[in-house]
Structures are given as C-alpha cells and as structure tokens.
C-alpha cells in the first residue's frame, strides 16, 4: 500500500531505518517499498568509470537537493576530473566540490582530511587506504574508515555548509589538514577562535577575474598547534596568500575521541561564509544528518512506487536522487534574509536567483521536463536565474559552470525556457526578458564562447542550414537543433500574441528538411552550393554530427515527427528505418576524432546495434514508434533499456549520467511515459515498470498510475484508461496529468 509522504516520514521517525546500516546500501529483504525512499539510494552508482569507458562518470555527492555545495571523498589527484573512482584504493581528502562532469571539471574546491602524523600534509603523503566494505555512501551521509590513519571520517550536509565527525586513535599527532588547493589560495588560522578561514581561486574556466570561494572551518575544541604550508614548504605565521596554501592543525586525542568540524563557504565574501555556517545552527552531527535525510525523503517521496523488485526500487530512487542534484543553487541568503548571488558572468554581487552547473544539450530532453512536472517551484527559481544570466552577460547560457563554458552545440536554452513558460512555471515578471533573450540568441554568437548563442546563424538564417563546407563542424547537429529551438520559441510567440514572430519561427523550424537525403533516408551534411557531402558514411561519428552519427541524429526532429515520417515514405518506411538502428552492426568510423571516444565503446558493448542510449541524441528515439503506430515496439525496447542498461551498482549507467538527464529518462520511463518534445503538451507512452506509482504534484493534485498485472513478462500495454476512459492513442497530456489523473494500464505478455 502506498502511504502519504507525511506518514512515511512519521513511520521513519518511529521505527527507524529499514535494513542494515552497514555497507553501501540498506539490506532490504522484501520487495515491498521501504518507509524511507532515501534508504534505497546508492550514491556510488556510476562511479566505476574512467576516460575510456563511462558507466556514469559520477561521484558520491553528499548534498541536499540542488545544494550550492556538494562534498565527496577524493580519490583522484588534485585537479583531476575523476575526483572519485570506484576502483581507487586511497582517499586524499573530503572535498567540497561544484563539479558537474569530469569533462567540465571543478571550481571553488578545497578539502579537509583527518590524519595521524605531523608530516603527512601533502595529498600524496596523507592519502589513506580504504575499503568499500567500511564505506557508507548516502545522499545525506558519508562515512569511511581511513586505514592508514586509523580514523573514521563522517560527514553530513546542508545547502551551503557541512558537519564532519572524526573518530581518532590515541595519538599526540592527530590532526586535520585543510587544503585550499593550488593556482592561488589563502589560509588564516584564528587560533583563539578554533577557526581556519581562507579562500580558493581554483577553477576550470567560466569565471570572472575576481572569482573566489571563501571558506570557514570551525573546530569544537582548541587547536593545540598548527603549521601553514605553501605546497610542501612550511611557512611561518598565522596566514598565507600563496600559490598553494594549506594548513595542518594538531590535537592530542585518546582512542575513540571525536573531533567535530563545521565548514561552510561563500562565493560572495568571508562574512557571507560565516553567515552560511549558520545553516548548521547549534545542531549536533546526528541532528544535521537526520534533517538531511528527512529533506531527501520529502523530495524523493514526491514519487512513490510499489510492486517492483528491491533492485528496481534502488535503481529508481538512485536515478531520482541524480535528477535532483543539478542545476545547483548559486545564490546565497544574507543576514537580513535577502537573496543575492555572485555573478559568474560579470563578477558583481547582485540581488536575485542564480543556478548553474548544467548543460542544456543534455538536460533539455528529460531533466527539465521532470522538474516542470514534479518540482516546478525549483524550476521557477532556475528560470529567474536564467533571466539574470541574460541581464548580466547578454546571453542565455548553454553550458554553465559556473559561467559560460565552451562545450557542446545547439541553442537549447530555448527549449528549457520555452517549456517552462508554456507550462506556466516561469515567474510572470521574467517572461518578457526571457523571450527577448531567446530571440537575441538566434542572431548572434558569444564573442569568446562559441557554443553560446548560435554559431553559424548567418548561414542558418539565410540558407536554412549550416553548410558542411564552410568550416563549422557538427553542422548537421547544429541545424537540426536550431530548427527545433525555433519551433520552441514559436510556441511562446503564439502564447504572447507575437504573430509575425511566430510565423517566421514556424517556417524556420522546417529547416531540418534541408538536410534530409532521400536516397539514404538519413540526415546528411550539405554544402553551400546545395550538394550533399561526399563521401558519406552513416557510421561516421562527429564531423557533421556531435558525439554520434547519422543513425543517431536523423531522429532529432522532436517537434515534427509526422513531417519526418512523411519524408521517409510513411509509417512503414519510418518504422523500417527505426528498426534498422537496432539491427545494423555497431561498426563505426572514428576518423574525425582520431581515436575511439568512450561513447562509441558504450554503444558497442550495449549490444543493441547502433542504438547509443549512453549518449543523449538517441534517448527519445524508442518513443518515436508510438507516432508510427507501433507502440508495442516502443514498449519492448523501453523495458530492454531499463532492464539491461541501468542498475544500482557502481557501473549502473551505460554512459555519462550527465547531470540528471540519463537518470530522468529512467524515472519517466519507469512511470510509463516520456516527453519526446519539450515545449509540447503530449507525453508518449511506454511500458511502466511498477504495478503502482503515485506522483504528488505541488498544486496538491496526485497522479495515480496503476498496472496491476505488471511483470517482466507482461511488458506490453493492452489497454490504457485515463480517469476511467479508454484511450485509443498511446499518449498522455500534461494538462490532464496536472489536474490529477488516474491512469490505468492493462498489461499483457506478447501474444
């Protein structure tokens, strides 16, 4: 039986957590849901990754949902994008991180490491062996035994602060290292206040010249002694501005004695870091941990599921956890309760919201549609932040971390902004600014970050496509995404009564047809003189496409699937081509890159032909069967992907998780529907994974999804009824769901 969220939390308080509290995940012995959804989450999913093969490229983030600061155990070297890898044997520190992806890397990071020894200060000498058998990784709590130091380290988060508890051995050489990292940092020891303050300037780009992350670290006992270093060189005095400032503070401890550390940071100022530390109040470690878990239970409990296996619950809630981390809050709250932010675009401290660390090329597809449906109040703040980003930089971001970053293609901020406006999520006062921003982005490109705005807009707006032979790479991908983005803006123009804009944009949205090759029935690069590129291989990755090939990108016509069906000769021809994606061998041409990129390997090992679920351009593809009158094929493949390519293990993804996108695909698919075209009202139906699900909407309504005959064999939808009325089409509308709908699936096996 599904219980209301409030009863779930009450039951958790009265009864405690279900299952074992040791190891990586709770040991739940039955297939009925736990009282606490947070107990199902493993933050280690996707961490068994490296440069050559991604099974998520994640790290175990100890954080609150959308929190400004995350914390993670650090196994990688300082500056490595792979901060934590499951196959590593040693931990170098507990790092405050803002990293969205190893490919984007980190900024504003520093670390705290408990040690035993006076000289074990730099990361090589202080690192300690650990075992996953003595590690617990939860969203709200992390603990590990640091074997070389004989210390148990624990941490629990708030949005901008964290509390740590270190259990020491008997030693007169116990200590804690605070490492502000290299590339310019500052440390000051305030001995009488049991406090260390400082800043780090480390970043990977996308920041103004005055960027700093100010931090404060406070101990619950007097500091016996301390030593500041610049790198490995000891420095006299109580403070240092240097290339690489770090400090070891010392204590004498009895065996089992605990030292509690409170830490916070601010991108605004040292005083604001002190203010952010107040998030912890006077709470002790267990109270902070309990509050963090309760917060996660509320957020994850917005969606309740039952009638699945324990492994399916673990995978589902681990994916929902990943779907509620990014984009992160980049705003702070001053002592008077005012919301303000350090602008990563112009370096000023300004009022209002700001969010960051997301790439819209990935997340427009599933993550933002999930926010609009289940967490619209969060996306309302994000949209207000996007309006601020435009005011502060003249552009909407496409990849923000924390400011504009040069990564990926497209102008998919238009999708993210449009879908929120059309679904009534965007604050009314920001709509005009955001509409202006979308139109402006069609006609220009950022002067230093060419992935922001529209590279090639002059060709696209005159020829109707970006030519293959004008020196702009990934031209087909750009054209297809610009066409879809124009359709999105057109829908907003209609809503706002901008009829001339709407007509112009609707026409431009048909530009995808300019790159369709009727001979191969695939999208293909086209030269400025109108001829198609030669030679042409549908297996060639990159070049005209982005991290994919023609088999992947031909389907990137989210807004006009019927038009694409017509180009392919109707439903039969369309279905034949879609079938072919799963049938053609996973061969490839990597000559554009000069080596086999990890996305190619992930496609190959999935054993699904040329279907590449590990990368975003293909993730909507299966649901296109619904538009061609073949919903059972969609249902088959959706289940295959969920069953074969996702799990709650460290290798639980089939490619980069990408800031909630690949996880949100699973969340939607497990519920039984998916938004193929953000900006539209219609979800395509797949195959629900659970026998029952309830979505608690912020407007007070609930969506109830029932599939009582559901099983691994009964993966096909024989009949679907919405509020008791049988639907003849495999689609659900957003407006119907928002009103609170009862959706019943009659599941059956293949006949």
Where does each model-flagged region fall?
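Sec-dependent N-terminal signal peptides
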Residues: 5-13
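ATP-dependent phospho-/nucleotidyl transfer catalytic cores
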Residues: 485
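C-terminal motif of bacterial Sec signal peptides marking the signal peptidase cleavage site
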Residues: 15-17
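Accessory carbohydrate-recognition regions in carbohydrate-active enzymes
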Residues: 25-368, 372-415, 421-480, 488-514, ...
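Bacterial lipoprotein signal-peptidase II cleavage site
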Residues: 19-25
């Amino acid at each position: 039986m599904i219980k209301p969220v409030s009863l779930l939390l009450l039951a958790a308080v009265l009864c405690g957590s279900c299952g074992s509290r040791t190891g990586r995940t709770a040991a739940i012995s039955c297939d009925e849901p736990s009282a606490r959804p947070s107990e199902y989450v493993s933050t280690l999913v996707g961490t068994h990754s490296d440069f050559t093969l991604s099974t998520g490229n994640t790290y175990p983030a100890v954080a609150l949902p959308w929190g400004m600061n995350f914390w993670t155990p650090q196994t990688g070297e300082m500056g490595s994008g792979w901060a934590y890898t499951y196959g590593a044997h040693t931990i170098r520190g507990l790092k405050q991180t803002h990293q969205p992806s190893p490919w984007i890397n980190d900024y504003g990071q520093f670390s705290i490491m408990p040690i035993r020894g006076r000289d074990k200060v730099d990361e090589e000498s202080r690192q300690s062996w650990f075992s996953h058998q003595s590690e617990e990784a939860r969203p709200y709590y992390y603990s590990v035994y640091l074997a070389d130091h004989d210390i148990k380290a624990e941490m629990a988060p708030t949005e901008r602060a964290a509390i740590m508890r270190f259990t020491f051995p008997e030693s007169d050489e116990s200590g804690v290292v605070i490492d502000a990292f290299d590339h310019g940092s500052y440390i000051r020891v305030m001995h009488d206040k049991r406090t260390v303050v400082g800043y780090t300037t480390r970043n990977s780009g996308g920041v103004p010249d005055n960027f700093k992350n100010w931090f404060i670290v406070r101990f619950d006992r007097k500091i016996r002694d301390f030593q500041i270093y610049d790198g490995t060189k000891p420095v006299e005095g109580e403070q240092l501005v240097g290339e690489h400032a770090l400090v070891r503070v010392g204590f004498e401890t009895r065996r089992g004695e605990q030292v509690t550390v409170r830490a916070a940071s601010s991108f605004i100022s040292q005083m604001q870091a002190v203010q952010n530390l107040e998030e912890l109040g006077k709470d002790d470690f267990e109270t902070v941990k309990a509050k963090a878990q309760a917060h996660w239970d509320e957020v994850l409990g917005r969606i309740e599921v039952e009638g699945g296996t324990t492994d399916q619950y673990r995978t589902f809630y681990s994916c929902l956890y990943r779907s509620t981390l990014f984009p992160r809050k980049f705003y702070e709250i001053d002592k008077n309760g005012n919301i303000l932010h350090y602008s990563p675009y112009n370096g000023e401290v300004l009022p209002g919201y700001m969010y960051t660390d997301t790439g819209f090329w990935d997340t427009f597809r599933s993550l933002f549609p999930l926010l609009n449906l289940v967490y619209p109040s969060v996306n309302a703040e994000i949209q207000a932040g996007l309006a601020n980003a435009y005011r502060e930089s003249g552009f909407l971001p496409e990849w923000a971390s924390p400011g504009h970053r040069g990564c990926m293609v497209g102008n998919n901020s238009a999708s993210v902004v449009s879908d929120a406006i059309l679904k009534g999520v965007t604050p009314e006062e920001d709509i005009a600014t955001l509409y202006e921003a979308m139109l402006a982005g069609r006609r220009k490109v950022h002067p230093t970050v060419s992935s922001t705005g529209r590279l090639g807009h002059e060709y696209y707006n005159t020829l109707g496509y970006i030519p293959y032979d004008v020196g702009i790479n990934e031209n087909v991908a750009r054209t297809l995404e610009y066409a879809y983005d124009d359709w999105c803006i057109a829908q907003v123009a209609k809503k706002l009564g901008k009829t001339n804009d709407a007509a112009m944009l609707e026409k431009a949205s048909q530009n995808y047809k300019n790159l369709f090759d009727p001979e191969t029935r695939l999208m293909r690069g086209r030269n400025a003189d109108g001829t198609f590129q030669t030679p042409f291989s549908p297996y060639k990755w990159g070049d005209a496409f982005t991290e994919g090939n023609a088999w992947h990108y031909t389907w990137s016509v989210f807004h006009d699937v019927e038009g694409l069906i017509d180009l392919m000769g109707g439903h039969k021809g369309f279905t034949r081509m879609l079938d072919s994606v799963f049938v053609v061998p996973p061969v490839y041409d990597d000559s554009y890159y000069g080596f086999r990129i990890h996305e190619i390997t992930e496609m190959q090992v999935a054993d699904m032909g040329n279907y590449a679920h590990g990368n975003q351009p293909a993730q909507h593809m299966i649901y296109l069967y619904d538009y061609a009158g073949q919903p059972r094929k969609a249902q088959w493949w959706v289940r295959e992907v969920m069953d074969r390519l996702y799990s709650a293990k460290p290798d639980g993804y089939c490619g980069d998780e990408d800031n909630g996108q690949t996880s949100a695909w699973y969340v939607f698919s497990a519920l039984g529907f998916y938004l193929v075209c953000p900006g539209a009202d219609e979800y395509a139906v797949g195959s629900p994974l659970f026998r029952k699900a309830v979505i608690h909407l912020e407007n007070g309504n609930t969506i109830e999804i029932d599939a009582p005959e559901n099983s691994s064999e009964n993966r096909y939808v024989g009949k679907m009824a919405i509020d008791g009325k049988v639907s003849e089409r495999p689609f659900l509308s957003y407006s119907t769901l928002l009103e609170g709908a009862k959706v019943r699936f009659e599941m059956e096996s293949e006949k």
